[in-house]
């Protein structure tokens, strides 16, 4: 059902307008023209006010209020920030990220860091950030001090990656830790755009997701459910400290793992990389050794190997 014929518009716009006009014909027929004009104006205002509004500003920081905080583990939280109106959306293109800024005690300048929301523009009225707090992480530590009702400065969109359906035949992904967040954004967009969901996206997806311990695997339930529902999405987990009877990878992500699990170098594939800087550096070298085009210092959309 389109937004024009949604239940909300039928009950909140069309029926009240019809009742206004009908009631006027009973009371005084001469007022029908005025009642009709009033109904049109009110209906237009109602329809317009319900239309999703993109709130991000790429040039100026805006304050967003912390609405909720969900503890995932001892050092990972999901922070939910409210948008100004319940119908507002962030307006973030798939593959891009936002900048968070804060004044940190002991720092001479305002600190700015980039994060990718795990929510999307399908989620009106709020956006969610999955953040791991690091001992030396200025913004991640600042987020842990926020209380419900506190504000955070946000600017965006930002980034060179903008995913479009079928931009390549096959996407390989290598993620480490919280580097899974931009990958999840792309994965969900592809699956949402499948033919069975009314789209035309047939992109194959293979993900290598590396972590230290089993408890460090973020969003595992959601990822596993997505893979269960979509045959064209496959995950290979890698752990430094695997449990007994582990059937995934062990140690660091190796060229052999990449060769076995990700698409071979070709003109219609892309490899996405996101994780801690040492891992990203190692994966750049590994992909180049396997015949993929050398990753640039600053990634561009057209690059075969793209690093977030």
Swiss-Prot record:
Protein's UniProt name: NADH-cytochrome b5 reductase 1
Catalytic activity: 2 Fe(III)-[cytochrome b5] + NADH = 2 Fe(II)-[cytochrome b5] + NAD(+) + H(+); 2 Fe(3+)-[Dph3] + NADH = 2 Fe(2+)-[Dph3] + NAD(+) + H(+)
Domain of life: Eukaryota
Subunit structure: Monomer. Component of the 2-(3-amino-3-carboxypropyl)histidine synthase complex composed of DPH1, DPH2, DPH3 and a NADH-dependent reductase, predominantly CBR1.
Known cofactor(s): FAD
CDD domains with a match to the protein in the record: cyt_b5_reduct_like
One Pfam family in the UniProt entry: FAD_binding_6
Pathway note: Protein modification; peptidyl-diphthamide biosynthesis
GO cellular component terms, A-Z: endoplasmic reticulum; mitochondrial outer membrane
Family: Belongs to the flavoprotein pyridine nucleotide cytochrome reductase family.
GO BP field: protein histidyl modification to diphthamide; tRNA wobble base 5-methoxycarbonylmethyl-2-thiouridinylation
Residue ranges crossing the lipid bilayer per the database entry: 10-27
Role description: NADH-dependent reductase for DPH3 and cytochrome b5. Required for the first step of diphthamide biosynthesis, a post-translational modification of histidine which occurs in elongation factor 2. DPH1 and DPH2 transfer a 3-amino-3-carboxypropyl (ACP) group from S-adenosyl-L-methionine (SAM) to a histidine residue, the reaction is assisted by a reduction system comprising DPH3 and a NADH-dependent reductase, predominantly CBR1. By reducing DPH3, also involved in the formation of the tRNA wobble base modification mcm5s 2U (5-methoxycarbonylmethyl-2-thiouridine), mediated by the elongator complex.
Organism in which the protein naturally occurs: Coccidioides immitis (strain RS) (Valley fever fungus)
UniProt KW keywords: FAD, Flavoprotein, Membrane, Mitochondrion, Mitochondrion outer membrane, NAD, Oxidoreductase, Transferase, Transmembrane, Transmembrane helix
Sequence positions that bind FAD: 144-159, 170-207
